[in-house]
């Protein structure tokens, strides 16, 4: 589905040169920003700097999904994502769907009957925030009007969400789910894509519009007089390059905090390790037409009495007997006769990293823990627990703010901008974030939601008060 390993960034730059804009980071955030500035607005002489090949540090470790289904407390995230999805759909049409955009949806499931009213309230809020109309099915007759998602593509699909509150209807439409599931929300303007293909599509267009790339690490940013004047890059050959510029964009992903410090800017960021596992579903348990399916309940893993006693006796494994967070999720990967299923459970979120560690710390139990947890969502997977299949595990970091909203816009240093803190939603947010960032840089009119993502929001007393009672962050 995706290209083979991308080629390293090109290396063709004098030791002292000038650029209109220097972008640090060739993940999806940096590439989308370069594309917006060069292709859409015609900005020339943009240099994209990264010590790794494009889209290889964290951008290629995601589940490659997108959604417009986000919590409040306002409509900023829904508005940002709706705009991103508009752009993704436009690019897909223009490229004959080169990056395989679909609209399978997100399927949120719960076995907690008491959650039904909360799901309805959340959906009503999402509707007012612009996520689309909500359709509620309380019996099988009402559910007869439900429209299934197509295997491929995104045209002619409903938006909004379908809410099932009748177990017989849930069994009819989602037969792989556990029989105790009592409510399901199928959010519809959601799906996934090939992130690698999207990144290469945008990067190729940006290069054709004049963006150049430099393989190296940003080692210093000169901000004499309170403004950006140059950027130093330690090149792949070990030589140091000075690029005179008045505009520097920090798209450094998990290293955004450290890169911000180079420019004298403090970014309130931390990172959480996230892993995902892939296996071949040779038993055909998961419907190949399924969306991204999430268990919205916390759970405790099932163990025999003997296993539980043994695990509880060791401080290193005691956590395996305790409740684990909601949000375990899976989706089928690939089309046609592909049998791959991706699974993710973000149970590492209690450990925060101020500085990310590479390579990632190993979690030797991850594959088994996720498979055991997934049985609560799809019981047909239980035979895989008894005989664990080969599972490929990789991962990266969710680098985020406390409220899990991105940083997009200027900083206190003139000419220094940030486009980071995209947590686990970088692929889906990058298009609209790049557009928003370009508006800041070029002095264009800003949409109302722009203020929700600027760094100076933390200087507003009303925002700090809102932050203290934030509620859900939408993290998966």
Residue ranges of model-derived segments:
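C-terminal lid/capping helical subdomain adjacent to the catalytic/cofactor pocket in oxidative enzymes
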Residues: 2-19, 411-476
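Beta1/beta-strand and adjacent pyrophosphate-binding region of the FAD-binding site
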Residues: 13-29, 47
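Glycine-rich FAD pyrophosphate-binding loop
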Residues: 38-60
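Dinucleotide-binding Rossmann-like beta1-alpha1 core, especially the glycine-rich loop
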Residues: 64-168, 325-328
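Short beta-strand to alpha-helix junction loop
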Residues: 79-80, 109-116, 185-204, 213, ...
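Helical element adjacent to the flavin cofactor pocket in flavoenzyme catalytic cores
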Residues: 178-180, 184-247, 251, 255
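Glycine-rich loop(s) and the adjacent beta-strand/alpha-helix scaffold that form part
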Residues: 250-292
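Active-site lid/adjacent beta-loop-alpha segment flanking the redox-cofactor pocket in flavoenzymes
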Residues: 281-413
């Amino acid at each position: 589905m995706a290209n083979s390993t991308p080629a390293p960034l090109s290396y063709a730059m004098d030791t002292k040169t000038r650029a209109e804009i220097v972008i640090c980071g060739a993940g999806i955030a940096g590439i989308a920003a370069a594309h917006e500035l060069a292709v859409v607005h015609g900005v020339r002489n943009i240099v994209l700097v990264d010590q790794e090949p494009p889209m290889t540090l964290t951008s290629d470790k995601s589940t490659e999904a997108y959604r417009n289904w986000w919590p409040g407390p306002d409509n900023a995230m829904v508005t940002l994502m709706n705009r991103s999805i508009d752009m993704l759909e436009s690019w897909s049409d223009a490229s004959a769907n080169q990056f395989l955009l679909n609209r399978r949806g997100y399927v949120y499931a719960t076995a907690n009957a008491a959650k039904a009213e909360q799901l309805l309230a959340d959906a009503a809020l999402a509707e007012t925030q612009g996520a689309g109309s909500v359709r509620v099915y309380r019996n099988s007759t009402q559910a007869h009007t439900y429209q299934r998602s197509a295997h491929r593509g995104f045209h002619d699909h409903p938006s909004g969400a379908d809410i099932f509150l009748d177990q017989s209807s849930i069994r009819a439409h989602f037969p792989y789910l556990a029989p105790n599931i009592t409510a399901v929300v199928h959010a519809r303007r959601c799906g996934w894509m090939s992130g690698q293909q999207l990144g290469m599509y945008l990067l190729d267009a940006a290069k054709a519009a004049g963006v150049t790339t430099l393989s190296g690490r940003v080692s210093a940013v000169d901000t004499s007089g309170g403004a950006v004047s140059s950027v130093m890059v330690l090149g792949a050959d070990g030589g140091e390059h000075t690029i005179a510029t008045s505009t520097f964009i920090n798209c450094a992903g998990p290293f955004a905090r450290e890169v911000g410090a180079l420019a004298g800017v403090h970014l309130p960021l931390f990172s959480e390790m996230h892993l995902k596992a892939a296996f071949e579903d040779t038993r055909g348990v998961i419907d190949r037409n399924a969306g991204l399916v999430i268990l919205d309940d916390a759970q405790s893993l099932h163990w025999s009495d003997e296993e539980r006693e043994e695990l509880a006796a060791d401080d290193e494994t005691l956590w395996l007997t305790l409740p684990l967070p909601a949000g375990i999720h899976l989706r089928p990967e690939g089309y046609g006769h592909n049998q791959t299923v991706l699974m993710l459970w973000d149970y590492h979120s209690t450990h925060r990293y101020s500085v990310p560690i590479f390579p990632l710390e190993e979690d030797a139990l991850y594959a088994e823990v996720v498979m055991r947890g997934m049985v609560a969502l799809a019981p047909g997977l239980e035979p895989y627990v008894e005989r664990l299949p080969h599972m490929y595990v990789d991962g990266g970091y969710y680098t985020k703010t406390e409220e899990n909203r991105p940083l997009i816009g200027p900083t206190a240093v003139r000419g220094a901008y940030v486009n980071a803190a995209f947590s686990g939603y970088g692929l889906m947010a990058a298009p609209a974030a790049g557009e928003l960032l370009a508006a800041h840089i070029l002095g264009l009119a800003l949409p109302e939601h722009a203020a929700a993502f600027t760094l100076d929001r933390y200087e507003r007393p009303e925002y700090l008060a809102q932050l203290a009672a934030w509620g859900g962050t939408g993290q998966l």
